[in-house]
Amino acid sequence: MLFWGAFLADHAVFGQSTSNSLDSTAALTYWYQPSFVIMHDMAIRNRVWIPEEIKNRSSLFGIRHSRGQGDFKAAQGTDGLIQSQLYTEGKTDWRKTSFWGRFSYDRSAEDSTALRHQSRWNVDAPLYFGSLRKNKYSRETYKLDAGIQRAFFDAKLPISLGIDYRLGSHYSNNDPRGDIKDMNLQFELSVGHNLPTLSYHIAGIWGYGSERVNVGYKNDKYTTNTEDPLYVNWMMNGFGSASERLKEINYNDIIHRKGVGAHILLKPNDRNKIYFNSRYLNEEQSFRRNDNSKQTYLSLNDYKKDIGSIDFLWSRQMHRKRLLRVALQGQIENGQDFNYSYLANNYTYRRHEISFKTQLAVHQYLFEGHAGMYKTEKKDGVSGNQMEFDQVKLGLGLNRTFRLGQSADIIGTIGYTKQWSPSHNLYVSELNTGDFGKQILYQDYLYDTAPRNSWNMSWVWGTHHAKNNWSIQLQMDYQCRGNLVPIDYTLSSVPGKNWFLGKLGVSYIF
């Protein structure tokens, strides 16, 4: 009662600047108040809107430490996570050109992860190595994102360029030892037209990436092991179709990406802004093992995926310091492989999702509601394995800004989300699927269909001087599941009851 009372008590607090200009908004409010964060994140996903929704000459430098612990996880998840992040972001305008950039360095350690050596960026790919033995994984990831826009002909013809670059290294420190290197580079070039109440942009997208995976053993006795099931290495090539792989445990995944995008902004009056963004991407992955042949490699699997997405956001400034935001996002993914062992398509993947979020700001309060529906299908043609499940999410949130004297604020947020699966089905072939594949399929099925309740709470303390501010962030997330659906297979482990994640960060705003 005291906790909710602190949120609902009526006190004078610092809120949005009286100016309608984004650049005059207090820096702490812009970076951490959810009604600004939702606009900021939309502009980062769609770089053509950087001049509209990114605060100029405000930069952020921060460090964050996270710890996660629990046994409610997917088959290839982790029991424990320790992560540290260093990041910086900012935007400036120079000679009629907008420049935005963000850099981050992440270092994490995962405890007790099994069944897949992976970068965690390519989770639906059909080919990977894994074992029943639990590993400790260390990961390092560098990310550099940028956006540039210059408007020509009296600001009527904007040309924008978005760049995303990622470089990662992932390795385990116990047998079987995985060593994974990944990179991704993507460009999006846009040309637009600005009118008094309408702006639109057409974009072309090109990307390239790769993953290099090697698995080995420090202890030589495991290199020819076929007796101890924990140390046997398996190669998955499909959905549950796995075979033992005792030598040449490596592959390269070459990724090519191309697509188009469209971005529209409507400004019917000075109180309303309506953004609509859409994209289509075609992604092609080629899994290869290097050899001494004339071609220099052996093709293992080609995986192609079509991705269509929409990103809608409506912002309305109402009377009496009230503000409404409505966001809608949707995505459709359709993937299928060409398996060179069968010279035919074997694996198919489909994922449809739509999510809705609304925010209503009234003075120092922000009320939020969100909902989402998700449908996933995975099939393996040779074995006959098939998994289908629907997921529904509903949630509520409350945010409040508290004034602490003349130079500091606290921004508090609490939220609750409920998720369940109204429809699901799993078929696993007893004859064509070994224990390794069954452990993955059944554990994931239990995890994805489990009803769950999630609670989150975050607090941000920060100063709001004209320049040079500090903030401290604390976040806690807790998730617990309900009853698991019944299955007719005995697993070595099932998803546990709980998962907890805590984050603590410090940032300097300048």
Task: List each language-model region with its residue ranges.
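A broadly used, surface-exposed interaction patch
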Residues: H117-A151
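Outer membrane beta-barrel transmembrane domains
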Residues: R120-S131, L230-I509
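N-terminal, post-signal peptide beta-strand-biased segments of exported outer-membrane/organellar beta-barrel
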Residues: H11-D111, A125
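Internal, well-ordered domain-core segments that constitute the primary functional module
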Residues: E140-M235
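Transmembrane beta-barrel strand/turn architecture of Gram-negative outer membrane proteins
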Residues: L81-R102, K181-Y208, S315-Q317, D390-N399
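Outer-membrane beta-barrel proteins
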Residues: Q69-Q83, N135-Y137, G168-D182, I249-D253, ...
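Short loop/turn motifs that connect adjacent beta-strands in outer-membrane beta-barrel proteins
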Residues: S17-L22, W49-S59, G90-G101, R150-I159, ...
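Outer-membrane beta-barrel "beta-signal"
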Residues: S19-A26, P196-T197, K497-F510
